[in-house]
Amino acid sequence: MLQQWLRQSPAAAGLLRCSRYRGPQAALLQLSPQRAPTYHAIRSLQTSAAESQERIPLRKQLKQGAKGLKAQKRQRRESEEASRQTWELTVGIEIHAQLNTETKLFSRASTSSTDTPNSNVALFDLAFPGSQPEFQAATLLPALRAAIALNCDIQPISRFDRKHYFYQDQPAGYQITQYYEPFARNGYIDLFKHDGIAPEDGDHVRIGIKQVQLEQDTAKSQEYPPSTQLLDFNRVSHPLIEIITMPQIHTPATAAACVRKIQSVLQSCSAVTTGMELGGLRADVNVSIRRRDEAPGTHQYGGIGGLGQRTEIKNLSSFKAVEDAIIAEKNRQIAVLESGGVIEGETRGWTIGSTETRKLRGKEGEVDYRYMPDPDLPPLYIGEDLVSGLRQALPTPPDELIELLAGSDYGLPIEDAKPLIELDDGARLEYYQDVVEILRSLQQDQDAKSRTILARVAGNWVLHEFGGLWTKADLAWDAHRVPPQTLAQIIDQLQRKRITGATAKQVLVMIFDGDRRSLPQLLEEENLLLRPLSREEYIALAETAMSQNPQMVEQIRSKNQLGKLGWFVGQMMRMGEKGRVEAQKADEILRELILGQSGSQP
């Protein structure tokens, strides 16, 4: 390598020459006579044979890496299991969700998040002296929908309080909330295995909801290090609900599942417009630890006693962050207690990708915030007729929809039913149901089993084939791009074996990309209709494929290695005219010729 470098660099070659070579460890470089001779030992530029032999192929490196990760996961599971036997984790969650409203909570300013910073601001939002709050009654409706969907008791009378603290994102020096008398209490949310709860929690967990309260959001801060911070007051006084769960969660995975499920419920009843992924929902988690073999702790929350000292981790913005932050804080508290330390009640932060929480400040209590009734706002009265009307107008809850889709009428696996419900605020589910209804009308005289099969086929196309095109194009969902009628017709043609699966996918892509020809016209003009092969043509293809590998034919005959039939089917499909060879019929002919099994003749 040195010689090559010297050849490519004549100037360097003129300055340097090797005085003499004594092996890799004694290589010396000497300056030319024009300069004073100075000698420096340098590292060998050669690669020894032993080093070259140690190079590991990439595939082997990947395998070793995968094994290492698997071993780490196994060790982590074993460590967590041992930890669970000794320590009890308790978690409570506070979820802050931006409501789906056009105006702010106490002013008529718009809640649009896309406008120019500081353009949607009323005098009260900036706490101008003399400005007064004007409660916007319309903001109550999505809050009520959320509380009803979370099985809460709506309170006929609720009141607003001031929570005092000073920070730059809250110009009034206090936040208006409902600390003492919230508008909703005593709710619950049910979590099931398919929601992602931890295996040790069984098949079902019910988490109590202590209360749901209305409150203001704060300004949006943007930091520009080292010393600049900009504030956008468009978000000040945006209506929020704070959902406070009971401390009844005992595993990190179930905590994340709880936040995910609550977001799904809020979206299903149009209480919110965005979720965690766009900043419309944030979570704070309260974490405490106690030894199982010791007396119950001295702390209590929400009427549940015997808890350890809790810490709060603020502003978690993803489901994974919820789970990871709880794991990190649990491990920190266990380490502190095992070393003889004491857990301090404090507020902590979490950074994505970190393995540790960090202290932000000491934990404030009720006295620190100086809660007091807001003298500028009257009590909030909620009539039973309003609650009853909203309850009747709510859409079907997600759990009931999953039960419907996984039932005998649709027969979808739960892993397909869940995304259909959650994607595109229910628009994907509505599209799917339209496709199924049209497809069933096209495929008349179907028995119950056949109707279920059609629904499952349609689910695969809507969620995976059609859904994959949207994911690849990175576009917002639009049902008009491929209307339900068109997709149902494509599936109908496939079910009637007038087109192949490959052709069906090709046609779907063409229509998705903007081809506006009717389906019959497109199939005819592009020569995509399946022209079935005769029995003789299938036999000719099969015999040709068999002649190419008689040894494999004998293995199928003598050793009953039926899995190798697939190779011959593939050969027949490659040899035949594109799209004309049907795999099922090819398999039937091969079984007849090789094994003497008679099937339905094509």
UniProtKB/Swiss-Prot annotation:
* Renumbered residue ranges of the record's region Disordered: 61-83
- Transit peptide location on this chain: 1-52
What Pfam family does this protein match (any one)?
GatB_Yqey
Q: Which domain of life is it from?
A: Eukaryota
Q: What class of enzyme is it?
A: ligase
Its BP terms in the Gene Ontology are: glutaminyl-tRNAGln biosynthesis via transamidation; mitochondrial translation
Q: According to its UniProt record, where is this protein mainly located?
A: mitochondrion
Q: Which GO terms describe its cellular component?
A: glutamyl-tRNA(Gln) amidotransferase complex; mitochondrion
Q: Name one GO molecular function term.
A: glutaminyl-tRNA synthase (glutamine-hydrolyzing) activity
Q: Which reaction does it catalyse?
A: L-glutamyl-tRNA(Gln) + L-glutamine + ATP + H2O = L-glutaminyl-tRNA(Gln) + L-glutamate + ADP + phosphate + H(+)
Q: Where in the cell is it found?
A: Mitochondrion
Report quaternary structure and partners: Subunit of the heterotrimeric GatCAB amidotransferase (AdT) complex, composed of A, B and C subunits.
PANTHER family the UniProt entry points to: GLUTAMYL-TRNA GLN AMIDOTRANSFERASE SUBUNIT B MITOCHONDRIAL AND PROKARYOTIC PET112-RELATED (PTHR11659), GLUTAMYL-TRNA(GLN) AMIDOTRANSFERASE SUBUNIT B, MITOCHONDRIAL (PTHR11659:SF0)
**Summary of the function given for this chain in its UniProt record:** Allows the formation of correctly charged Gln-tRNA(Gln) through the transamidation of misacylated Glu-tRNA(Gln) in the mitochondria. The reaction takes place in the presence of glutamine and ATP through an activated gamma-phospho-Glu-tRNA(Gln).
Family, per entry: Belongs to the GatB/GatE family. GatB subfamily.
Q: What is this protein called?
A: Glutamyl-tRNA(Gln) amidotransferase subunit B, mitochondrial
Gene source species: Aspergillus clavatus (strain ATCC 1007 / CBS 513.65 / DSM 816 / NCTC 3887 / NRRL 1 / QM 1276 / 107)
